């Protein structure tokens, strides 16, 4: 199963927290000290906590669980999309719309509208419209794709959230908490770990660190899914006998 070593984390700068004046005292147990007024995260805590989170995500994906990757700030946006796509999972990488989980019924209607517009753009319907109407629909399609494209095939609520930057994505975490969906999150020294089921203390800004987390999670999810496919194949083989 995918694991991450301390050497990997040091190379990626996972240990660099935020400036000491921005700290959240709830993160004190995970802080090693400070250097040049920047908090240093204790990787002896982070390594086992991240690997424990990976093991749990592996189990969830082996049960066909759906994992929603959330990272809407610029540093994470593209990497979040790539990681989710690489393991056939789902993502929100632009703005988190309030109610995305807690008001799923309404979100589902918007997803239906998105899919209808996609069909219209491909089957020639747009060509039959006036230029103005076609432009309006194209804009609506782009807007919906931007906010819902990563979850349009999710088909229901996710079984877990993997979040880059607990502070930035606090609304998503709160919604998941309200619905009892487990939250796995990268929590920097300026963030509140409350509401996060699997806290991963680490830098949430450095692109190398963000890529390290996402790469490891995507790999562990792919492994979990292949275990699930292997057990399905085994079952059908037994039935055939």
From Swiss-Prot:
Transmembrane segments: none annotated. Keywords: Ribonucleoprotein, Ribosomal protein. CDD domains: RPS2 (cd01425). One of its GO terms (biological process) is translation. GO terms for molecular function: structural constituent of ribosome. GO terms for cellular component: cytosolic small ribosomal subunit. Pfam families: Ribosomal_S2. The keyword Ribosomal protein applies. InterPro entries: Ribosomal_uS2, Ribosomal_uS2_bac/mit/plastid, Ribosomal_uS2_CS, Ribosomal_uS2_flav_dom_sf. HAMAP family: Ribosomal_uS2_B. Belongs to the universal ribosomal protein uS2 family. NCBIfam families: rpsB_bact. This is Small ribosomal subunit protein uS2. It comes from Klebsiella pneumoniae (strain 342).
